[in-house]
Amino acid sequence: MQRVGAASPTCSSLQAPAAAPPILTISPHHRVKTAETAAEPDLLEPTGVHHPFHSLSPLTEARAWAAREGQYFNGLIEANGGASVSKGHPDLAVTFLTDHASCEWFFSQRQEVLDRQDGAYFGPLKCKKQYIGESLPTLASNQKESHQVLREHKLRVFRSRVPFAQSAMTNATDTFYKNLRDNGTGDYTVVYDFFLQQTIHFLHEWIYGLGVEGGQPLPPFKDFMNANPLDVSVLLELEMDTPVANLAAKLAQRSKKPSAEQLASVESIAEAIRSSDVWAGFVEMLEDSNVNTKDLERSFMFTTNFQSAGAIAKGMMPVVATLTNNPEFLEKLRKEVDGKDLTFQSIRGAENFPLLDSFHWEINRMFPAPAFTVKEAKMDLVVPTSSGKKYKVKKGELLMMEQALGQMDPSVFGPDAREFNPERFVDNPELKKKVFAYGYVDHDKVDGQWGCAAHAIGMLDGILKIIYGRWVQEAEWELTSVPVISPDEFLAEVGPADMSFAKVTSRKKM
């Protein structure tokens, strides 16, 4: 969902010399290196367009990509003869990977094979310093030593809070639905805004002890709305790798400067974190490990507000949309969860709630976050594809792995791979292993150098399933418009972007 980055190196030519050295191909399963030569007849070069150094086209291509990502990739794949590996230039000159085999290969590589672009966090976007100060945005997963050390110690901090997750979830969710019974939606009818109230409360009580547990109140919710808006362009800046396009992008983004009110809200949240009962212990824990703690509260704020609470609230848009468009499944799911206590223990695995579990994994499959990842080839490589074709990539080139497309590969998920099927995994639970959940190929091995931290500490599946299940138990709703669920339009998302409730009522009596 979020992208951060600095300007990429100029894309080198893909033409191989007559006597090319061996190119390494890495097995996605065993990571065994075997040499293949560029002279092999089945080794292909990606086709497509990388724009000239002084072109404005990366900006116009980026706009087309952002506006209708599904249409963009349909056109790209068609223009390249159906190839699942091809070149494109939406802000950065990249080689796209768009099928299951190439995505699995991408996720499986060690940092000496594929690494984040030097200094980059999410690819072509970077977070504005007004939000993170001098800190690195945590969990960004680039392999710079300072980040990797910080990530490991933050995971240790988060693990120390695992015993408090259940009480925080119970308090936040009970409060959220009591407010619904008492006040309806109030001022927050946009789906993202509505659920952000719940996710902000949960994350800040769980990680910082704010709210019910610690007795210290949360800052006003309007501060979180100001600091974590649905239009995230106010937090992020787009980077281009051609000077003309980069200048045009910066001029266009001048109107997106954070306001004085937004900056005051950021400071309000940062101060609440610094003042929490647990913060001094966090800082001491990290200082004892020689971690630079300058602006550390802003790094944590970026994690709990933007990457966690904001991401879960945005993820509720496809949840609401797919349940709205599948009323028969919604009724079946209600029969499964009604009257049941949804806890981290009870929802573990699929045994107790097979429909809820399958729905959760289908959401993961079609609406992954992040939907793509950018990394740099640290050596000449060969990329496998689901069709059996192999493509060569040169050292220094950027690869953009499109996870949502890889998880809609019909060779793995069948002829209905581009359709939402909430019961897809009920009778075929092994198929879940083909979903790259939160950036992991192997769901049982979460100690990798990238991938979601909440999953790494064993919490994210439970968090999401409880939030989904409680919504089904607690609420009846109507939307202001029919949701658009089409990968030909909104890849890894649903439309419209400002999806809103016409009405939400409690299913439970006052």
UniProtKB/Swiss-Prot annotation:
Residues 1-31 form a transit peptide. Optimum pH is 7.5. Heme binds at residue 452. Gene3D superfamilies: Cytochrome P450. Its cofactor is heme. It comes from the Eukaryota. It is found in: Mitochondrion. Pfam families: p450. Pathway: Lipid metabolism; oxylipin biosynthesis. It catalyses: (13S)-hydroperoxy-(9Z,11E,15Z)-octadecatrienoate = plasmodiophorol A; (13S)-hydroperoxy-(9Z,11E,15Z)-octadecatrienoate = plasmodiophorol B; (13S)-hydroperoxy-(9Z,11E,15Z)-octadecatrienoate = ectocarpin A + H2O; (15S)-hydroperoxy-(5Z,8Z,11Z,13E,17Z)-eicosapentaenoate = ectocarpin B + H2O. GO terms for cellular component: mitochondrion. SUPFAM superfamilies: Cytochrome P450. Keywords: Fatty acid biosynthesis, Fatty acid metabolism, Iron, Lipid biosynthesis, Lipid metabolism, Lyase, Metal-binding, Mitochondrion, Oxylipin biosynthesis, Transit peptide. One of its GO terms (molecular function) is heme binding. Its EC number is 4.2.1.-. GO terms for biological process: fatty acid biosynthetic process; oxylipin biosynthetic process; sterol metabolic process. Cytochrome P450 hydroperoxide bicyclase involved in the metabolism of oxylipins 'ectocarpins' natural products, such as hybridalactone, ecklonilactones and derivatives. Isomerizes the hydroperoxides into epoxyalcohols via epoxyallylic radical. PANTHER family: ALLENE OXIDE SYNTHASE, CHLOROPLASTIC, CYTOCHROME P450 26. Belongs to the cytochrome P450 family. This is Hydroperoxide bicyclase CYP5164A3, mitochondrial. The gene is HPB.
